[in-house]
Regions:
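Auxiliary Fe-S-binding modules of radical SAM enzymes
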Residues: 1-17, 209, 216-312
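Canonical Radical SAM [4Fe-4S] cluster-binding loop centered on the CxxxCxxC motif
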Residues: 11-49
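Hydrophobic residues in beta-strands and at strand termini
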Residues: 22-24, 107, 286
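Glycine-rich phosphate/diphosphate-binding loops that line cofactor/substrate pockets in enzymes
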Residues: 62-65
């Protein structure tokens, strides 16, 4: 490493996110790994469902400095235009009556263009998350993503042009993935410079093409340890660039196999500290919410010591 202090960063703003799940809506194809309906356990929400969900969250959640409604789980900007606008109008109602501060959504990189970005910008959308998964051309093909890496670069550029914050969602450990694929994704962060990322270690969801390939013996899963180490590679690449990693792993549910530790984020961060120590890195700047990971790493490397720093 050729920099003096490795700085672990965390998201500085933690708004209350009110999720509205639109599982697989807008998706024009099925990626090899995806089954959003089983992951979320919900189907298409009506406008009444949206209103009920938002009001319910607002009624029992502790007030925070910021509150946002998020349309997750599908390809929001690929919805039929009138359906998308109906959801947007419902969200805008809550913004304009002062109940929430902004809207956000998730979508595919190939479903962002200047027209749609302008609609989002003019409708109080401040964050858009792109399901990138990988920046390796070969792996994108294996995942059946039907777009290339250049499309990701272009969509990020468009969103930034309109002043919309960008989050990127990556997958690690897909069965066809190689170490080189992860290195390509990690390196791409230097150009993409998202505002934050999420990392989802691979889980073989039921009724997905790749799960059937695993079951038939066509392809094998990587070991959990291999997947965790590749997750660490991407995690450290983000940390080096001071890009917050706001989540690691899918939410737990009855339809998501329990492959990884419940404290997955802490485990990955601890492995990151351990890797840095092994490589000879001697100074880390660790925010409060990484201290558990530091203590976990200290069990492996007892010589690690914590010192107070005014910048930490």
């Amino acid at each position: 490493m050729n920099f003096k202090m490795f700085r672990f960063v965390a998201a500085t703003q933690k708004p209350l996110i009110i999720p509205v799940f639109i599982p697989h809506l807008g998706c024009k194809r099925q990626c090899a790994f995806c089954n959003q309906r089983d992951v979320t356990g919900v189907t298409e929400p009506t406008l009444e469902d949206v209103e009920t969900a938002v009001k319910s969250y607002l009624s029992w959640s502790k007030p925070r400095e910021r509150t946002e409604i998020s349309f997750y789980g599908g390809t929001f900007t690929a919805l039929p235009r009138e359906k998308m606008m109906n959801y947007i109008r419902k969200g805008v109602e809550f913004v304009e009556n002062g109940k929430v501060n902004a809207l956000r959504c998730s979508t595919r990189p190939d479903e962002i263009d200047e027209e749609r970005a302008e609609i989002l910008k003019n409708s109080h959308f401040e964050v858009v998350e792109l399901g990138v998964q990988s920046m390796s051309e070969s792996l994108l093909g294996k995942m059946k993503r039907a777009h290339d890496a250049e499309t990701v670069f272009k969509s990020v550029e468009i969103l930034k042009k309109f002043g919309i914050s960008v989050g990127l969602q990556f997958m690690t450990g897909f069965p066809y993935e190689t170490e080189k694929d992860i290195e390509i994704s990690a390196k791409s962060l230097e150009v993409l410079r998202p505002d934050f990322i999420r990392i989802y270690p691979f889980v073989p969801l039921k009724n997905t093409p790749v799960e059937r390939e695993i079951s038939s013996g066509t392809v094998q899963m990587h070991s959990v340890e291999t997947i965790l180490e590749r997750t660490v590679t991407l995690f450290l690449a983000a940390m080096k660039l001071e890009i917050p990693v706001i989540r690691i792993g899918l939410p737990q549910s009855s339809d998501v196999p329990e492959i990884y530790p419940a404290n997955l984020f802490q485990v990955v961060a601890a492995k990151a500290v351990s890797r840095l120590a092994t490589e000879g890195e001697t100074e880390f700047c660790i925010p409060d919410n990484f201290k558990t990971s530091f203590n976990m790493a200290k069990k492996e490397f007892p010589f690690l010591e914590k010192t107070e720093d005014s910048d930490s």
